[in-house]
Amino acid sequence: MKPSVILYKSLPDDLLARLESHFNVTRVPDLSPETIEAHASAFSEAQGLLGSSEKVDAALLEKMPALRAASTVSVGYDNFDVDALSAKKIALMHTPTVLTETVADTLMTLVLTTARRALEVAERVKAGEWTGSIGPDWFGCDVHHKTLGIVGMGRIGLALAQRAHFGFNMPILYNARRHHSEAEERFNARYCDLDTLLAESDFVCVILPLTDETHHMIGAEQFRKMKKSAIFINAGRGPVVDENALIAALQSGEIHAAGLDVFEQEPLSKDSPLLTMKNVVALPHIGSATHETRYNMAACAVDNLINALNGDVSQNCVNPKAVK
């Protein structure tokens, strides 16, 4: 008899068929209490869980006593209670490799769009303001040969460094938990402490997961240490940055501009001051949002669940030591 799994995300037809060839699949719209109550038997019997964005905590796990593996269609997993999963020896699988290049593209897009004020001036053209030769009020700033500071030199940081170094001749500074020999050898990246990176970088790009240690890691003190001409980029996790401190730094001219794909509250509140600032590019968390990459992420998540329920957590497992 095939194991039972709960699917709380839409999948392409071919991936759904692959999942159903291995498991008895119960499809649900979400993980709300109402949904769990309506499908109580399926939740109690499910050995697998697959989806994204929903909160998976100890209370949910109490409703799923047979659960052996959860697979998220994402690289981030801050919506999962990893300790609670590990305590019950439930494997948590994620998709860290398939979105690297696409998220790095998004980061480079934010760098370029913010520096050259591309969205702002495009809207001015559409509004009919382009009536002759443009003056300095249309100008942005150069990207090439400017110093890029990367906070968090993981897979995505390395892919961003490659684009910046080879594509734009940008010197690379980075701060991470340890030295990254590949970044130093391939891109001549220089490891430095965070304060030095903030003081010397023209672009500060934060690519960090959300943990207790990284929550509000970038705040008022850090913005004060940046150049007034600095452009701040965040495409990691919103709460890594104290958003009120960022708003204050932008309003006061402490930093020049910001390009943001993530926020403390998502979707971004309609009354957020960030939405009225011309020196802010705000994207709706599109880091991995291309047709190709989202398909590959879903395929990876399906394969991860199949592997985990077959006892293989050698790849893409957040908590392998807890389940062995």
From Swiss-Prot:
Q: Which GO terms describe its molecular function?
A: glyoxylate reductase (NADPH) activity; hydroxypyruvate reductase (NADH) activity; hydroxypyruvate reductase (NADPH) activity; NAD binding
Q: Which UniProt keywords apply?
A: Cytoplasm, NAD, NADP, Oxidoreductase
Q: What protein name is recorded for this chain?
A: Glyoxylate/hydroxypyruvate reductase B
Q: What does this protein do?
A: Catalyzes the NADPH-dependent reduction of glyoxylate and hydroxypyruvate into glycolate and glycerate, respectively.
Species of the source: Cronobacter sakazakii (strain ATCC BAA-894) (Enterobacter sakazakii)
Where in or outside the cell? Cytoplasm
Q: Which gene encodes it?
A: ghrB
> What InterPro entries does this protein map onto?
D-isomer_2-hydroxyacid_DH, D-isomer_2_OHA_DH_cat_dom, D-isomer_DH_CS, D-isomer_DH_NAD-bd, Glyo/OHPyrv_Rdtase_B, NAD(P)-bd_dom_sf
Matches recorded under SUPFAM superfamilies: Formate/glycerate dehydrogenase catalytic domain-like, NAD(P)-binding Rossmann-fold domains
Record has NAD as a keyword: yes
In which family does this protein belong, per the annotation?
A: Belongs to the D-isomer specific 2-hydroxyacid dehydrogenase family. GhrB subfamily.
| Quaternary state and interactors | Homodimer.
Offer a single GO CC term for the protein. plasma membrane
